[in-house]
């Protein structure tokens, strides 16, 4: 028996050697964890809309970028994991454009049924099409490596690939919302300031504490022909009319107080299922998630089974698991945006973005409050936000964008909404590109290059308040028809009742620029009309609807750019097919010497004529 056992051991050993030789991995010749080192000009932590816009804008301006996102999808609060609606400045003429508009138009083109999972991929596509971006999904920042006062690298862990990353960079952008790069020692705040610290009259007596606005788990409903009762899990709350039976506080001046709990199905995304403001929205995140689940199931059970039949034709289609956050950490920058900045319209020399949502200050007690859930103060139509809100006052190579910018609690109550944070992300990413270009710091960009930053943002279709874009020199030196002169006013949208555009009939009309002498033209910049005024960009609150959305009908679909050479002939120098974007920045294959340039529209997405806001020769 001993010889048999010895023979078996020998055979097993030989088999193992053969298996390893053939490529089988075992504990002897493989790893459980992996280590990888990466390096880029700009490292962006956080892949919500602010982080996406920051990464893409920096990449398009020539930087190598690493985007680190701890979730499997991009989009943050707007993603399919959370499904919060994107809102921003009030009024059609104030609609946020730039990269956010590009993403939303891509969604219209490739997601006509407005499904949330496909919306995720509209955001994803915007990132992965940029060759300068390395995207790390499912990757959480765990620590920072410092070099004196500066951040030298991030340490991160990828849960899918079991990989430890050391990510080196020259500039670091925190778009996480929760401010993980505070590990650098950057100054920050959590909670509500006293009213007298910044003279914020709307704070009242509710300041000087660590309370914040809460988190929310959302619901999505589906219309149905049949009515079936709903039973919530045993661990959920079970509400009755008494839980919703209290007086709505009346309006007051200067704020309007609302309860907002609306247990009815119409036009409802259930943002008011909110909790966590009285505790810590970071440290207590798991407890908050469970409490919100208990509330969400209880709310739906109450609504669905209500004797008045308010939800008899609805079923619960989706309930969130990941809460959306409104507030946690606010970094401290050279400027702290306050209530007074917002209400005085934010006339800053270093303006780089704008807001326009109300000062929407949620009660930390949130859903469990029997009083008001929010106090909204009407703000100016739009207000400027300065560059000094986007970089650290004490860590020289740290910038930030999103809900962790430098602001008071009251200031953040307006700037935290996602259309605004997308603009802030684009501004931060563009500013980061200038930091890399000049080998300097955000503070020095603020001091020496703010005008260049503002021009770049406007050129990228990010409107800035209290100023208009400067058309190109070539455009201004050309002659054109009186009707086309509006294209060189720098106002790339309808504004205060003025159209600011021209109508072009496909196959019949064109926009023509002429020069007295031949000029060298290397490209063109065009702003088509994406119909801010006629549509909503928000995802649907009801799931499984079959109504399709379309690319805006007056958008130019197919077009040509033609140049007239010295021979007097029109030559096509660029042809665009299937266009669905508002901003087109076009580089010709090679510069052309011409004494005329024209934009020819071949087709639209359904309208009889295309509407164009700008056509610049470059």
What are these regions (language model features)?
Residues 51:
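N-terminal Rossmann-fold NAD(P) dinucleotide-binding loop
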Residues 21, 31, 39, 57, ...:
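Conserved N-terminal/central alpha/beta ligand/cofactor-binding core
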Residues 1-17:
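Bacterial Sec-dependent N-terminal signal peptides
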Residues 13-42:
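Extreme N-terminal leader/targeting segments of oxidoreductases
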Residues 46-48:
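Glycine-rich Rossmann-fold phosphate-binding loop(s) that bind the pyrophosphate
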Residues 18-22, 29, 153, 160-473:
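Flavin (FAD/FMN)-binding glycine-rich loop and adjacent Rossmann-like elements that form
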Residues 469-493:
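Predominantly extracellular/luminal regions of secreted and cell-surface proteins
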Residues 495-572, 577-618:
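Aromatic, loop-rich ligand-recognition surfaces of beta-strand-rich domains
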């Amino acid at each position: 028996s001993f010889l048999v056992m010895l023979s078996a051991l020998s055979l097993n050993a030989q088999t193992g050697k053969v298996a390893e030789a053939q490529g089988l991995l075992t504990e002897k010749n493989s790893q459980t964890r992996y280590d990888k080192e990466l390096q880029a000009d700009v490292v962006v932590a956080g892949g919500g809309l602010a982080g996406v816009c920051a990464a893409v804008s920096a990449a398009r301006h020539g930087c190598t970028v690493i985007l680190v996102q701890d979730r499997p999808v991009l989009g943050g609060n707007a993603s399919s994991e959370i499904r919060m609606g994107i809102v921003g400045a009030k009024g059609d003429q104030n609609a946020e454009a730039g990269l956010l508009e590009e993403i939303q138009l891509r969604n219209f083109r490739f997601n006509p049924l407005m499904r949330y999972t496909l919306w995720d991929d509209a955001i994803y596509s915007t990132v992965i099409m940029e060759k300068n971006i390395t995207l790390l999904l499912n990757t959480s920042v765990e620590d920072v490596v410092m070099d004196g006062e500066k951040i030298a690298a991030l340490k991160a862990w990828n849960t899918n690939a079991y990989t430890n990353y050391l990510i080196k960079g020259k500039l670091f952008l925190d778009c996480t919302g929760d401010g993980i790069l505070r590990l650098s020692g950057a100054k920050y705040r959590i909670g509500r300031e006293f009213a007298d610290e910044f003279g914020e009259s709307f704070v009242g007596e509710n300041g000087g504490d660590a309370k914040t606005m809460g988190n929310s788990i959302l619901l999505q409903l589906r219309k149905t022909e049949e009515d079936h009762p709903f039973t919530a899990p045993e661990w959920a709350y079970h509400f009755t009319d008494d839980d919703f039976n209290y007086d709505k506080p009346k309006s007051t001046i200067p704020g309007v107080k609302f309860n907002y709990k609306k247990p009815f199905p119409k036009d409802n995304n259930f943002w008011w299922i909110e909790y966590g403001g009285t505790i810590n929205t970071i440290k207590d995140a798991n407890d908050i998630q469970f409490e919100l689940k208990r509330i969400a199931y209880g709310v739906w059970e109450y609504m669905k089974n209500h004797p008045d039949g308010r939800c008899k034709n609805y079923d619960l289609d989706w309930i969130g698991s990941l809460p959306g956050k409104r507030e946690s950490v606010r970094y401290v920058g050279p400027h702290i945006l306050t209530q007074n900045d917002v209400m005085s319209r934010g006339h800053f020399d270093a303006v780089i973005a704008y807001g326009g949502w109300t000062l929407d200050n949620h009660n930390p007690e949130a859903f469990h409050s029997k009083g008001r859930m929010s106090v909204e103060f009407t703000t100016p139509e739009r207000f400027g936000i300065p560059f000094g809100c986007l970089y650290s006052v004490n860590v020289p190579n740290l910038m930030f964008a999103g809900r962790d910018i430098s602001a008071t609690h009251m200031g953040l109550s307006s700037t935290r909404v996602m259309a605004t944070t997308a603009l802030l992300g684009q501004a931060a990413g563009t500013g980061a590109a200038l930091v890399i270009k000049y080998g300097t710091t955000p503070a020095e960009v603020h001091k020496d290059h703010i005008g260049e930053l503002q021009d770049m943002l406007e050129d990228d279709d990010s409107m800035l308040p209290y100023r208009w874009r400067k058309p190109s020199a070539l455009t201004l030196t050309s002659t054109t028809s009186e009707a086309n002169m509006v294209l060189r006013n720098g106002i790339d949208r309808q504004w205060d009742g003025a159209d600011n555009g021209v109508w072009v009939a496909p196959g019949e009309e064109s926009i023509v620029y002429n020069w007295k002498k031949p000029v060298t033209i290397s490209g063109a910049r065009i702003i088509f009309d994406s119909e801010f005024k006629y549509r909503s960009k928000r995802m649907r609150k009801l799931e499984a609807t079959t109504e399709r959305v379309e690319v805006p009908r007056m958008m130019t679909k197919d077009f040509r750019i033609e140049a007239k050479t010295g021979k007097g002939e029109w030559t096509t120098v660029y042809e665009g097919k299937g266009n669905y974007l508002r901003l087109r920045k076009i580089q010709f294959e090679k510069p052309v010497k011409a004494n005329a340039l024209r934009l020819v529209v071949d087709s639209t997405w359904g309208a009889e004529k295309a509407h164009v806001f700008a056509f610049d020769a470059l």
